[in-house]
Design a protein with these regions (language model features):
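Active-site metal-coordination/substrate-binding segment of hydrolases
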Residues: 67-161
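Short beta-strand segments
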Residues: 76-78, 168-170, 193-196, 216, ...
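Glycine/charged-rich beta-loop-alpha catalytic/anionic-binding loops adjacent to active sites
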Residues: 120-135, 218-222, 342, 374-378
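Metal-dependent amide/peptide-bond hydrolase catalytic core
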Residues: 234-405
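N-terminal capping segment at the start of a domain
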Residues: 2-28, 129-130, 318, 378-379
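Acidic/histidine-rich catalytic neighborhood of metal-dependent amide-processing enzymes
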Residues: 121-208, 248-268, 272-282, 288, ...
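Phosphate/diphosphate-binding glycine-rich loops and adjacent basic-rich segments that engage nucleotide
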Residues: 194-227, 231-237
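A non-catalytic alpha/beta surface segment that caps or lines the substrate-entry region
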Residues: 22-70, 74-76, 80
């Protein structure tokens, strides 16, 4: 079975994670796909398949006889999807021999356009998989799941020599909980790769340092007709906070290694207001400087409006795994060579986000990220090609071969 065929089967199983949940996994529906995957792994002949109470699926492919002492490597992908644009069933649409031009997405009124996605002409002639324009596709990261499963099938059925291989499928990556209950020792690999990137051939090991920053603003309500020098409007103080941040250091205006402040939510009235940000930077010193900027804003506004008016809470989320991967750059060099062996130009790029591999690297499992062939994740324009997925599978198979040498 080709990887894209598996993807079509997986995306119709709803698995949105829930950022407001306090359970693990954050949504019980993730077990629906986990059980399907565990059964499929067993049917393929993968060993030691297990599904635990936290919705982690593990499995192993024992080394080919004579290769038991080769480096053990693992492959990881996440089962959950973002909850945005996912309030009903996903309907994938297959466009064979795509012409590379603008493409209406069902009857949604949305169109996949070359203007918005300039890479589309390069996909001409491919089998393109899109949504109907009303949901995400879920290729993030069910494409990675499908590619790992297809790799496993190839290793087993084609008797490709390999060392010990570990596989895991995780829940809750999209809400930052993908490694909360990951058992590194049970997984059993010395090194691993997540398949959670974009274009096939991407190799990523430099991610953001990340935190979230929440402001709570307490106002002072007085009748507006008699509020001279008395009222403190919490909404206006909230506006002050945002205006004190650098206006060009937002996601829309940044790229590559540039960091940002991203306002993800706001609410309020005269008496109470809230601002919710995520803060990102690749450079540790610049990241700490961003947090200090936020603390400075809190201090200044409390001096202006009175102590306790503004309360800032900063919560660190993940770190840049580059400092860990720097000690095992064979992971990157072998990934480059695997791409070349598969006929794909390697593309080493910084991750403008994070993956499960970020946390796993700091848990003792160095774990860079590889591309899946997908594009425009987290929205109704998400798309992927069957051919790109085939190449992603070829790359990981070549990677396995390299570690068996």
């Amino acid at each position: 079975m080709r990887a894209y065929e598996r993807l079509l089967n997986y995306v119709v199983v709803r698995t949105p994670s829930d950022e407001h949940s306090t359970t693990s996994p954050s949504s019980q529906c993730q077990f629906d796909l986990a059980r399907i995957l565990a059964d499929e792994m067993t049917a393929l002949g993968i060993s030691d398949v297990s599904l635990d109470e936290f919705c982690y699926v593990y499995g192993k492919i024992p080394a080919t006889p004579g290769y038991e002492n080769k480096t053990s490597i693992g492959f990881i992908a996440h089962m959950d999807t973002v909850s945005d644009y996912c309030d009903h069933d996903i309907i994938p649409v297959v466009h064979k021999n795509y012409d590379g031009g603008d493409l209406p997405l069902g009857t949604s009124g949305r169109t996949l356009t070359v203007k918005d996605f300039p890479h589309l002409p390069s996909l001409a002639g491919c089998t393109l998989i899109t949504t109907d324009g009303t949901t995400v596709l879920g290729a993030d990261d069910k494409a990675g799941v499908a590619e790992i499963m297809t790799m496993a099938e190839a290793l087993i059925k084609e008797n490709i020599p390999h060392g010990p291989i570990s596989i895991a499928f995780t829940p809750d990556e999209e809400v930052g909980g993908g490694t909360d209950h990951f058992k590194v020792e049970k997984f059993g690999a010395q090194f691993a790769y997540t398949l959670d990137g974009d274009t096939e051939g991407e190799i990523q090991y430099e991610n953001f340092h990340a935190c979230k920053a929440d402001f709570e603003i307490t106002g002072f309500a007085v009748h507006p007709g008699s509020s001279k020098d008395t009222m403190i409007n919490a909404c206006l103080v909230a506006a002050e906070i945002n205006n004190m941040l650098p206006g060009l250091e937002i996601p829309r205006e940044t790229e590559d290694y540039e960091g940002f402040y991203h306002l993800t939510g706001m609410s309020g009235d005269v008496t109470k207001a809230e601002l919710h940000y995520i803060v990102r930077d690749h450079d540790k010193n610049l990241f700490e400087a961003r947090k200090e900027t936020l603390r400075h804003i809190e201090k200044n506004l409390n001096e202006k409006w009175g102590e306790g008016t503004v309360k800032l809470m900063i919560t660190d989320q993940y770190q840049n795994m580059a400092e860990i991967i720097a000690g095992c750059m064979h992971l990157i060099e072998n990934a480059k060579k695997a791409c070349e062996n598969a006929g794909v130009a390697p593309l080493v790029l910084p991750i403008r986000g994070g993956t499960d591999g970020c946390q796993l690297s700091f848990m003792g499992l160095p774990c860079p990220n590889l591309g899946t062939g997908g594009h425009a994740f987290h929205g109704p324009y998400e798309h992927i090609t069957a051919e790109g997925m085939d190449k992603a599978v070829d790359i990981v198979v070549e990677l396995v071969k390299l570690y068996a040498e």
